[in-house]
A protein has these predicted regions:
Chain A
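Cytosolic-side transmembrane-helix boundaries in multi-pass membrane proteins
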Residues: 1-38, 42, 224-231, 301-338
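Hydrophobic core segments of alpha-helical transmembrane domains in multi-pass membrane transport
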Residues: 28-41, 70, 118-121, 147-152, ...
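Single transmembrane alpha-helix segments in multi-pass membrane proteins
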Residues: 38-43, 50-102, 106, 130-137, ...
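Inter-helical junctions in multi-pass inner-membrane proteins, predominant
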Residues: 45-55, 154-161, 203, 209, ...
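Alpha-helical transmembrane segments within multi-pass membrane transporters and channels
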Residues: 103-146, 293-294, 298
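Transmembrane helix-bundle core of multi-pass membrane transporters
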Residues: 139-205, 232-235, 254-263, 307, ...
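Transmembrane alpha-helical segments in multi-pass inner-membrane proteins
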Residues: 244, 254-321
Length: 338, 508
């Protein structure tokens, strides 16, 4: 082989990192978060208090965890619209199982119910993945279909009403999963950090993560590199289902009840969090920590609106809708520059 | 009017001392060019010599940092973007600017539709389109959808569009890169016809034989500098190539090493059919460089993809060292030491938005997994090794692959394939769209790999390449393997005879 001998001892000139090296797209969501914190502090001094911020972070848990899953799906070039319905469906089945009294021992029952939720969530994700890949249906359409199916099944299970956890014993046993704290930190915040850390490790430091990015950047290049494209995509949907299940594990102890309207429009919020976080909607670069940042931003905006008196909180949906459009515009203008 | 006397003709377009700087990088240094009426002017240079930037400046897509452009002897500042078309300066891009869902007529009149009382006058537009197409001798249907046209016909529509806008100078960036030889001939006929009517062409190409064939004058750029402008008749391909690289190209092709006849057969293909590839059989020996020649569309890529397991095969067996390879199992083929390097490096070979390292290790990522997670330092070592081994030159290691020159991309793609440590390497079009200097390097890499005992199949539409590199050449025609040439038989005439169907071996 031709080996150029003169470059054996390659000079390692340590390039000075300048501000131009910073990837604007990675930094933008965090800059926006800081900006929001400042705005919030100006609007209402109570806002910047630790209690309020911890509250906001806790409330963002559902969307944040679901959005971590969505980061995988979107990075691999797909989309999952069914997550909101999936939350309602999985939560309903979990509560129905706990109400069935199949297992007498409450702790054992709770563990079994949690395992069941994880299994159902993964199965729902697997269904989405297989319909998209084996069925060769656009993910937008495939998950629009399952979105209707999961929602419809929930409505049928609840007969249009609510499904409520009956046993007070189970309720009090399960309550700390959402309301409890460890060393003063609310459990949901710890769950967010744990889920995100695992997700970041999988996406950035494993073979599978590299494959997700490759599949999302170019299916053809991935195929010609010997990557099992359909398997990578399907697993991304399963990860999404798993994340939905984890969100349900936090959701059920909070209210102890679900209905046909549980999780409505959560898919919009999850996708918004992902896009605000800097992940490209066309696939490729995935940013897990950015996604978490995006979820906080959404919740903070709501919180600021609540604390301030000049915008009605009924406009939250409209504001969140605007945020996704603005985020896309910002993303595009940053792409052009770099 | 100026009399058309020699030496007294006023250039239609003249560029004086054009310089261009992007950020801190200067890419053009006082480049000069003049285009005479009715002239085909070839612009050649290695990748990165500044050709593309230069013609973008001349057609108004970029603004020069300094220097001026004269139209008919008068200084002009070209309006931004395609507005220069109004002045008769039209650029035909490598990737066509045609909307797939429009008809030919609609494409031709896009943005300047003929209207009567505010309603589209379809009949008038169709008639005008037909007139222009007839003038070009093209039989393209004016009502056909662009998406239904062959690549050559799309090119023709682009040219028709240029003419219908009364273009005086037409810039063509590698117009023949995607055309077969027949299609190229048709295109060149049209160019000659238009030239006779006074239209001028500036023609960027890497194919020096075509430059020799079609152009009246040649301008050579190297590293952003103007090197020479001369009548084509005073030059030959070798001389132009030397001007482009600035050094002797005495050994464009390395010396051939023919393997012994009793050397082990590493790859054996028997009766393979897929798509319209029919009943192909051949053997490949250890250390051999086997060429696959034939016209575009003769089924070579389909055959190779079926061998590599990227597509299914309907019949036939593939054996690696005597062991059968399962159908349509690319990863098994990779594991058994067979690699396929695609000809479509941008669409199928490399992730253009990613950096070099993640591209390099994409196919062999398993080697960099330690205890279940990726080891970045191991990947960085592989990258440093590949850069040395394949002489990949970049200013910044973190550059996006899409920003690298074609030659560096091709070297990176080869490096990526070699990371899987293959013993059998199928290289589809090893030097498509890359400059002479890099071509020479890639040829030497291929020869060196063969000397190491690896076996290589080179699929190429460039005859000199197949002839210069390979010890045996297989010729395909319409899905069949029609000839296997060895030793003295390997010549352009012989290969063309088989490829065109004038000759055929009954038993190959």
């Amino acid at each position: 082989m031709e080996v150029s001998t003169n470059s054996e001892i390659e000079e390692r000139v340590p390039r000075r990192r300048t501000w131009r090296d910073v990837d604007l797209r990675a930094v933008a969501p965090f800059a926006a978060l800081v900006l929001l914190l400042i705005v919030g502090a100006l609007v209402n001094p109570n806002f910047i208090g630790l209690t309020n911020l911890a509250n906001v972070a806790t409330r963002s848990a559902f969307i944040a965890i679901i959005a971590v899953g969505a980061t995988f799906v979107i990075s691999s070039g797909d989309l999952d619209l069914s997550v909101g319905s999936m939350v309602a469906f999985v939560a309903s089945l979990m509560i129905l199982f706990m109400n069935s009294g199949a297992i007498a021992d409450p702790s054992l029952m709770l563990v079994a119910a949690m395992v069941l939720a994880v299994v159902i969530g993964s199965a729902c994700g697997l269904a989405n993945g297989l319909i998209t890949t084996v069925g060769r249906i656009e993910p937008f359409i495939a998950t629009l279909g399952t979105m209707g199916i999961y929602r419809g099944l929930t409505t049928w299970l609840s007969q249009g009403g609510a499904i409520t956890l009956n046993s007070p014993e189970l309720q009090s046993l399960y309550r700390p999963a959402y309301f409890g704290t460890v060393l003063g930190v609310p459990v949901p915040i710890l769950v967010i950090l744990l889920v995100t850390a695992i997700a970041a490790f999988v996406l950035y430091r494993t073979r599978y993560g590299r494959h997700v990015v490759a599949v999302g950047s170019s299916r053809e290049v991935a195929r010609y590199s010997g990557i099992a494209v359909d398997r990578v995509r399907t697993i991304a949907f399963v990860i999404q289902g798993l994340c939905v299940a984890v969100a349900v594990l936090l959701y059920v102890p909070r209210l102890g009840s679900t209905s046909a309207t549980t999780g409505i429009l959560w898919e919009l919020q999850a996708i918004t969090a992902v896009v605000v976080g800097g992940t490209a909607l066309k696939g490729g670069a995935g940013r897990v920590w950015g996604t978490i940042c995006g979820a906080f931003i959404l919740e903070l905006v709501g919180n600021i609106m609540l604390l301030s008196n000049f915008i009605s909180e009924y406009l939250i949906g409209a504001i969140q809708g605007s945020i996704i459009i603005v985020a896309m515009l910002v993303q595009r203008s940053l792409t052009r520059k770099s | 009017m100026v009399k058309p006397e020699d030496g007294a003709r006023v250039p239609v377009l003249k560029a004086e001392r054009i310089s261009k700087t992007f950020g801190e990088v200067q890419v053009l240094f006082s480049v000069e060019l003049d285009v005479l009426p009715g002239e085909v002017h070839a612009l050649v240079g290695e990748n990165g010599a500044g050709k593309s930037t230069f013609i973008k400046i001349l057609s108004g897509f970029e603004v020069p940092t300094s220097g001026r452009i004269l139209l008919d002897g008068e200084p002009v500042s070209l309006p931004a973007n395609s507005a220069a078309e109004a002045l008769g300066i039209v650029m035909i891009h490598q990737e066509f600017n045609l909307a797939e869902h429009l008809t030919v007529t609609e494409s031709l009149f896009l943005g300047r539709e003929i209207c009567r009382f505010g309603v589209l006058d379809r009949r008038a537009m169709r008639a005008e389109t037909r007139r222009v197409l007839d003038m070009l001798g093209s039989r393209v249907d004016e009502n056909a959808l662009i998406s239904s046209l062959a690549v050559a016909d799309k090119q023709m529509v682009e040219i028709a569009k240029a003419i219908s806008r009364e273009a005086r100078v037409i810039f063509m960036d590698e117009p023949t890169a995607v055309l077969s030889r027949e299609e190229t001939d048709v295109l060149f006929d049209q160019v000659r016809k238009l030239k006779a009517k006074g239209t001028s062409f500036v023609f960027v190409s890497h194919k020096l034989d075509e430059v020799m064939e079609i152009s009246d004058r040649v301008t050579v750029l190297r590293d952003g500098q103007w090197i020479k402008t001369a009548p084509t008749s005073l030059l030959d391909g070798e001389a132009i190539a030397q001007l482009m690289v600035g050094r002797e190209l005495s050994s464009l092709y390395p010396s051939k090493h023919e393997p012994n006849v009793d050397e082990e057969i590493v790859l054996s293909v028997r009766g393979l059919s897929t798509g319209y590839v029919r009943d192909v059989s051949f053997d490949l020996r250890k250390g051999e460089v086997l060429g696959f020649s034939g016209l575009i569309g003769s089924g070579r890529t389909e055959l190779m993809e079926a061998i590599a397991g990227l597509r299914s095969r309907t019949t036939g067996d593939v054996e690696i060292r005597g062991r059968a390879l399962p159908v349509h199992d690319f990863r098994e083929a990779t594991a058994r030491g067979l690699a396929y390097m695609t000809k479509d490096r941008k669409g199928r070979g490399l992730l253009l938005d990613e950096g070099m390292t993640s591209n390099l290790t994409l196919q062999s990522i398993g080697q960099h997994v330690r205890h279940g997670y990726l080891d970045p330092s191991s990947e960085a070592k592989a990258m440093a090794r590949a850069k040395r081994r394949f002489d990949i030159r970049v200013r910044d290691d973190r550059v996006r692959v899409g920003r690298m020159s074609g030659g560096n991309q091709q070297k990176l793609l080869l490096a990526k394939i070699m990371e899987t440590e293959p013993q059998i390497i199928i290289i589809d079009e090893p030097t498509r769209g890359i400059d002479v200097g890099t071509k020479q390097q890639i040829y030497h890499f291929i020869a060196a790999l063969a000397r190491e005992g690896r076996s290589i199949i080179v699929v190429s539409s460039e005859l000199p390449e197949v002839i210069g590199l390979c010890t045996r050449v297989a010729v395909m025609r319409e899905g069949h393997l029609v000839g296997m040439l060895e030793g003295e038989e390997i010549s352009e005439q012989m290969i063309m005879r088989y490829a065109a169907g004038l000759r055929r071996q009954t038993a190959v």
